[in-house]
Amino acid sequence: MQAAALPEEIRWLLEDAEEFLAEGLRNENLSAVARDHRDHILRGFQQIKARYYWDFQPQGGDIGQDSSDDNHSGTLGLSLTSDAPFLSDYQDEGMEDIVKGAQELDNVIKQGYLEKKSKDHSFFGSEWQKRWCVVSRGLFYYYANEKSKQPKGTFLIKGYGVRMAPHLRRDSKKESCFELTSQDRRSYEFTATSPAEARDWVDQISFLLKDLSSLTIPYEEDEEEEEKEETYDDIDGFDSPSCGSQCRPTILPGSVGIKEPTEEKEEEDIYEVLPDEEHDLEEDESGTRRKGVDYASYYQGLWDCHGDQPDELSFQRGDLIRILSKEYNMYGWWVGELNSLVGIVPKEYLTTAFEVEER
């Protein structure tokens, strides 16, 4: 979404309001209720700026930069909570709910200890600091340790490139270095515990970047070759929490009644191969002509999923979910519909329900 142009007087007013909350009330003796109200409003500023790409104070940098890593003096030091650095200099797009503890993150792609190169280290400080790093939902977090309640810094991975970088060091660890670079943002340099671990970080981030640049999850080359030789495994082959007798009969989209599960050989595909003629018009038992079903938009639940938030859709293993939108694909979520209920669903919990023949 492109931000609408704001009149200058409105931008100034918003800047003044945010600065007053951040700087003007910094040293005031506020009650707990007043502090909560202030922090709530400041969070609202950050979410609106991120959602609509508005940057009232165009200062570079990432979220909550580590004071030991990045010379931060002079920037806002207020907190969203009593001890969290205020994020007013953050300008990466589309980011919300970024102040999370290391153990609170979900959909983690890669995590572990790395040495991060500081941008401006002091004379007595080390150039490389050990950080607990996590890649989750298109974000790169780095913490003081794996139990930290808030990150030292966070940045959006989209728009970066990643590669091995042995030129960063001249000691025995040079083959364990990698970096993330961007044309219009600062670079990040890291050292892993071993060359193999560094390559794994590079591979995982590269795979994520491919996913962020498309609406489908890319496959590794060896996986593509295997798929040409094999049929899809039966869904019962997936490890999941207890299903047993709880697996329910499947209601096919566009069909009348319930299709009871049958006991057939395990090698049989779970996918229904549909002829092209069924795509345009179908005929039900009453002989009425009706519009065909878009089978490509249907996905099947791999495991039970219970939504924790009101906008999350709950479903069980085997449920057929119609995907309405993939606009939140970069965060690992799609918008789906089940039994006339609409909500977001984690794409990792879904698999294609039908294999449609191409023309």
Curated annotation (Swiss-Prot):
The record's section on Gene3D superfamilies has: 6.10.250.220, Pleckstrin-homology domain (PH domain)/Phosphotyrosine-binding domain (PTB), SH3 Domains
Question: Which regions are flagged for Acidic residues bias?
Answer: 219-237
> Is-annotated flag, keyword Cytoplasm?
yes
Cite the InterPro entries for this sequence.
Answer: PH-like_dom_sf (IPR011993), PH_domain (IPR001849), SH3-like_dom_sf (IPR036028), SH3_domain (IPR001452), SKAP1_SH3 (IPR035765), SKAP_fam (IPR037781)
UniProt entry tagged with the keyword Nuclease: no
Q: Where is this region: Interaction with FYB1?
A: 290-295
Q: In which tissues is it expressed?
A: Highly expressed in thymocytes and peripheral blood lymphocytes. Also expressed in spleen cells and testis. Present in T-cells (at protein level).
Q: What does this protein do?
A: Positively regulates T-cell receptor signaling by enhancing the MAP kinase pathway. Required for optimal conjugation between T-cells and antigen-presenting cells by promoting the clustering of integrin ITGAL on the surface of T-cells. May be involved in high affinity immunoglobulin epsilon receptor signaling in mast cells.
The protein's name in its UniProt record: Src kinase-associated phosphoprotein 1
Q: Which organism is it from?
A: Homo sapiens
